UniProtKB/Swiss-Prot annotation:
Pathway(s) it belongs to: Mycotoxin biosynthesis
Functional description taken from the UniProt entry: FAD-dependent monooxygenase; part of the gene cluster that mediates the biosynthesis of cercosporin, a light-activated, non-host-selective toxin. The perylenequinone chromophore of cercosporin absorbs light energy to attain an electronically-activated triplet state and produces active oxygen species such as the hydroxyl radical, superoxide, hydrogen peroxide or singlet oxygen upon reaction with oxygen molecules. These reactive oxygen species cause damage to various cellular components including lipids, proteins and nucleic acids.
Any Pfam family hit: FAD_binding_4
Enzyme class: oxidoreductase
Record EC number: 1.-.-.-
Residue ranges constituting the FAD-binding PCMH-type domain according to the UniProt record: 10-187
Species of the source: Cercospora nicotianae (Barn spot disease fungus)
UniProt gene name: CTB5
Protein name: FAD-dependent monooxygenase CTB5
Keywords: FAD, Flavoprotein, Oxidoreductase
Amino acid sequence: MGSYFSLKNSDLHPSCIALPRSAEEVSKAVRTLSLGAHKWEGQCQFGVRGGGHTPFKGAASTDNGIVLDLLHMPSAGISPDYETITVSPSTTWDLVYEVLDAHNRSTLGTKVAGIGVGGASTSCGVSYFSPRYGYICDMVENWEVVLATGDIVNANANENADLWKALRGGINNFGIVTAVTLKAFEQGPFWGGQTFHSIETRQEHFKNHAKLASAHPYDPYAHYINTLVLANGGHWFIGNSIQYTKSDPPVAEPEVFKPFLKTERTPIFPGLPEDTLRVDNVTSFSREYAANTLYPQRWQFACISFAPDADFMETFFQMANDAMQQYVKLPGFKLILNYQPAPTVQLERNGAVDSLGPIQTEGNVVFVHWAVSYDESEAQFDDAITKSVQDLFHAANTKAKELGIYRHFIQPTYADSWQSPFDYRSKSTIEELVATSKKYDPLQVFQKQVPGGFKLPQI
């Protein structure tokens, strides 16, 4: 259990962990568990683990039930024409990139190495290439799925198309995905890296960020995250992620990032670099970003969104600082506050077929990926920290609404258990998802027996 990204999952004690090595073995397990629940109502609870990165307790585990760990599921690999790649849900994105980089190809995947394909592809993960191509789920050409009956089916644009659409953003509500086939596209090395700054420069970053996030049209090659880190003891620093994904040839220091590069850079510690800017491949960038993340620790994610506004970025920073000061001396404490632009071109997703529905239509968005971590020894602070974050987000949303800059959107891969992504989707989208769930899972096994993840609303 200590292999999960967040040690909150170690609080749960499954009765058994199964490690299937094929879709057929997953099928046997699901059929047995489904029959058991039919005979003993409320029993035979199970969790499904792909990469095990979702941090909240029970997302991919269960207490006194069964965990189906997909760690040993096989991957078919890249197709002969290099147009697709088929991998298991437990494959981490950096391994996918490593295969594709060798052929100057890529796909949409997470920006951080070590995260499994399954969760990010069935939800609404964001990529370095999302302004050009949309969300990770929109790259899935085919799902191999084990249904509650134990049947193994393919879901794609021509076969079980409604299930294909539902799984593109519908999370774990329809079956167990045992293989994911992703579209690949031409992509060579590109320019990017991290830049480090003192916290006193933050308002320069906020102004540049708001200008970039408000841009119409948005440069689809521009990827940027403004990251502010509150470290143990109360020291803040800034470590931004900048990528310009145009390749063949790559463009160093493109015009869109010139204002950002004028801000004074400062190493986090003496002897460290002030930036890591270079031309490199996506495998390298993802592993660099992952190296900044300590685990195993206890982690909490959350997400909040608003219109691009430099003043509100400062307001939220001050509110976050005030809310977390009481915890900064906890062993291992760290707050990572990521401001990320979500331009209209990304939200519209090139008209992709998925189950996200119409995402808010009020223009470009800035969303916050909130991540707090601390050592396992401080587990007694879980509830207090969660309550502090909930109070902070409620106050921030209230303030944003007063200013007319609230945006009804959260990024599902960054949401905590109290933030259901389905609350942010349209009524018609939810009705379609529920209908698909009842069609492929008439006994609602994945609603009743699999408590982890985000369940569909009852309508």
